[in-house]
Amino acid sequence: MKLSVPETISNPRDFLHTSVPQLTDLDSLLRCHICKDFLKASVLTPCGHSFCSICIRKYLQKESKCPLCLSDLTESMLQKEFLVQEICSSYVKLRGSLQKHLTISSQEEEKDNEIIISDEADTSVGTKRGTPDSPSLSSVSTKKRKHDGITTLLMKKKTDHPQRQEKKAQCPICSKHLPLSELEGSHIDECLNKGSSLERSDSFEILDERTPSPSMESSHQPLEEKTSLPSSHLLEVKEKKDITYHNERYLNSGLLQQKENRLPRLDFQSLSMTQLKQKLASLALPSNGTKQQMVARYKHYEMLWNSNFLDSIDPVDENELKRRLSSWEAKHNTDHSSDSNSITNLLRGNKRTNAISAMIKLFKSDRFDRKGWMRHHTSTFKALKLEAQRSDKLAKMKKEELSQKSDANSEVSSEPILKIDQTSENN
């Protein structure tokens, strides 16, 4: 009796042997982690994980916890995800075409898997490489062997090229950048011998050590497994991690601990200007402008804060949030953006105070940077100089005004005396 087996069983690893192996990550993300098939009627949990509706409901009948992060979960907490469902359905329709167009053809695969193993005889010291009558060329015997699996991404048929300027490439085993001549020599064999005792993952297994044929063992000449290693055809260690980076980050998202609390909404009608300014100051935000502008500033920062620290899988720090707020305020809340209390100036001020405090620590030592101190305070010195010149001018102007007034008063006071003298003479 034969069991009925589906004709095709899809697997995220189907894309490992294509020209875009990173699609493995996308394929895994669109699958339910209970049934391992593509999401159907996707629902979202409060902890941010997606499952098929029927799968998670069956699971919750046995245990009231999220299968991935073990957070408390009930059916009433599940939310519909129409967008994810449509994305998944669209991908399922395109998956076959993607795999067909991106899969490397069998002929190219055979060419890429071929390794030329050359057995070179020892030559005399004076013999030059590449001469027509060189004994090494006559004693070379080649044998082609095929590798399967992930090695299609690691190996390429060796072609004879004239010797050019020495180039470097990255070793797929130890990830070191070495000259091609060294990599084509015994370096890879040494790396494989060292790493043969280490455990390797099923998805990214590097070349297995192969035992040479008896005919090759009989000749007491060194064997060299040669392969050209251009960086464009190597699956580097970084790229291997990138293939499953998003999927692993999603699976580990439940382990992330929420460090920051939710920023609450405020009842702005009941808050006075003083209370609102105190609230902004407690968040290290500027408290300038009208009440309407301060309310808009707080609302936008509240939105940035909660979406970053509560919903993002990769949150940024507070300084980045304040930079985003500054950018938003420059476009939508510009009346007081140039004030000394604006966000941009506050951020700049923090950097300046840090630099000044570092200088002050060295003020009494020989390491004090006097020129740096002068450069840092050049604008302040200029402002003080201009202010002193203005005050000097004002003082001179006041003196002149006072002297002019005193002269005018003396002239006015002398006129009645002259009149009195004239009247006395007439009498």
UniProtKB/Swiss-Prot annotation:
Chain positions covered by the region annotation Disordered: 113-170, 202-228, 392-427
Pfam families associated with the record: SAP, zf-C3HC4_2
Biased composition (Acidic residues): 113-122
Biased composition (Polar residues): 212-221
E.C. number: 2.3.2.27
Keyword hit for Endoplasmic reticulum: no
GO BP of this protein: postreplication repair; protein monoubiquitination
Keyword line: DNA damage, DNA repair, DNA-binding, Metal-binding, Nucleus, Transferase, Ubl conjugation pathway, Zinc, Zinc-finger
Family stated for the protein in its record: Belongs to the RAD18 family.
UniProt name for this protein: Postreplication repair E3 ubiquitin-protein ligase RAD18
Organism of this sequence: Kluyveromyces lactis (strain ATCC 8585 / CBS 2359 / DSM 70799 / NBRC 1267 / NRRL Y-1140 / WM37) (Yeast)
Gene for this chain: RAD18
